[in-house]
Structure formats: C-alpha cells, structure tokens
C-alpha cells in the first residue's frame, strides 16, 4: 500500500476515534438526558408495548421473508414500507415528533422493524448496540455522527420496551445536534 494511502487511512481512523471520544458539552448532555427520560416514557406507552408484543408473537410472512438486500431496494412509497409509519405505533411516533427528533424507530426482540417515522437504512439492528443494549434492559447513547438515513448530524439514543417485566424490543430516537443547542 502506498505511503500516502496509508497516511490517509490513518487520518480517517484517527478522525473517527476523535469524534466518538468527544464528550458533549454538559448543557447539551443535560438536554439529551431529558430526551432520554421522555423517550423512556414513550417506550412504556400501551400503543408501543402492544405493537412490540404482537410483532414478537407472530411475525407476518412478508416481514419474515424480508432481507437487508431487498429492504435497500424498496422506496419510501412502497406499501410494505409505508405500513410501518402508517400503523398505530408509527402514528404514535409521528405524534411525538419535534424539531429535535430527526428519526425514531421501534424494533421487536428480533431487531426487525415494528414502526418508524421514516424508512431506516437497515431492516434489522440486531447485533448493534442501539438494539442489543436496550434488549439487556439498559439505555444507550451513540456518538454524534451524520446519519445515513436522514443526512443530518445527530446522535441516537435507545431505550428498552418493557413487556411483562422484561425487555421485549427497543425504541431508537435520533436527536438533531443543531436543534439541541
């Protein structure tokens, strides 16, 4: 590998680590913490709990057959995609949207989508901290980054959806960094 490419790669890796290591200003972190509290209340709402419970009990065949490759080919106008923001849980998320919230999506225990504000980049988030941490009963806060699906500089927070005293799914919400300031 040429030295210039190696240096460029090293710089990119350093920049990524710097972004992830950067702590938020305490005033901004306080706003993120307040959003986390609000989102935990959403995750306990009967509409979201019911949607996750139903998803976990019986995954529809069209959802079971969905793959990441196929998901990427679907447009936001596809009836399959629209079903996730038009269902009752999707409408609940829409009712909670503010200028600070850039995205929100609800996943079942399997990491597959139950509802969202807008089509997500990935069909499943299983195996990623934003889903796995809430599934262990913890909240999660990601780094500030440019989100693939929204194109905005945001950070994501995630909370468990509790059903029967146990984590049954996850609720991930993207917060617009510029609107938190």
What role is predicted for each listed range?
Residues 1-8:
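Bacterial N-terminal signal peptides that target proteins for export
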Residues 3, 18-19:
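Proline-rich, low-complexity intrinsically disordered regions
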Residues 8-18:
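Bacterial N-terminal signal peptides
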Residues 21-24:
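Boundary of Sec targeting at the N-terminus
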Residues 26-121:
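Extracytoplasmic/periplasmic sensory segments of membrane signal-transduction proteins
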Residues 105, 170-172:
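Structural recognition of the beta-strand scaffold that forms the well-ordered cores
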Residues 116-168:
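Extracytoplasmic/periplasmic ligand-binding sensor regions of membrane-associated signaling proteins
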Residues 173-181:
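Helix-start (N-cap) segments at beta->loop->alpha junctions
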